[in-house]
């Protein structure tokens, strides 16, 4: 209990007092490429998904309430998303072992990518950082089949986000 309060206090402090720097990502720009490992230690490059839509969502921490809600909603909507020629990639600074437990516990059918050094989150301006403490922000980027940012979300409601993503993908593909 004590450690949970300390961790929650630290997370609140990071969110309250850290700055994100410049707003570096803009719609229409090329999405920064990366190579990260998933929960099965399989490498994924963004460029491997050229020709498909990509829902790249950053989240703070495996198996926490909001992150679990968001991931499970993407799980429940995965067939509708894939019918739209899109793939879901989740990213946090958690390690691959944590991702494997989280994915296994909730039956997540998409890659959870480990950004342990937070370089990818930083390149997408999706990082809270306070010294050695780093946490991914809850941001989502829709990347078109040409590898460009089609839309991004800085304020995400985990309860309805996957439904919103489906509606936007349908609109973008008209």
Q: Can you name each region flagged by the protein language model?
A:
Residues 47-68:
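Short active-site neighborhood of thiol/selenol oxidoreductases, capturing the structured segment around
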Residues 3-33:
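N-proximal helix/coil linker or "cap" segments that precede and/or mark the start of modular domains
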Residues 25, 38-39, 143-144:
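Short, acidic, Ser/Thr-enriched surface-loop or helix-capping motifs
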Residues 34-53:
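A short beta-strand-turn-helix
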Residues 68-108, 119-120:
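Structural microenvironment flanking redox-active thiols in thiol-disulfide oxidoreductases
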Residues 135-174:
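Thiol-/selenol-based redox modules, centered on thioredoxin-like
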Residues 31-32, 53, 137-139:
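Short loop/turn microsegments at loop-to-beta-strand junctions
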């Amino acid at each position: 209990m004590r450690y949970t309060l300390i961790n929650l206090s630290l997370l609140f402090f990071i969110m309250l007092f850290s700055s994100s720097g410049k707003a570096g990502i803009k719609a229409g720009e090329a999405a920064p490429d990366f190579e990260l490992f998933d929960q099965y230690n399989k490498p994924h490059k963004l460029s491997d998904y050229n020709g498909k839509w990509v829902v790249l969502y950053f989240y703070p921490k495996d198996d926490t309430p909001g992150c679990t809600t968001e991931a499970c909603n993407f799980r429940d909507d995965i067939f509708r998303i894939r019918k739209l020629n899109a793939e879901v990639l989740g990213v946090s600074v958690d390690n691959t072992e944590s991702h494997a437990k989280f994915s296994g516990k909730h039956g997540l059918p998409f890659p959870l990518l480990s950004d342990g050094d937070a370089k990818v989150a930083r390149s997408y301006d999706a990082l809270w950082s306070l010294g050695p403490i780093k946490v991914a922000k809850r941001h989502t980027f829709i990347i078109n089949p040409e590898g460009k940012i089609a839309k991004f979300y800085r304020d995400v409601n985990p309860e309805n986000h996957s439904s919103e993503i489906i509606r936007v993908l349908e609109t973008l593909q008209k």
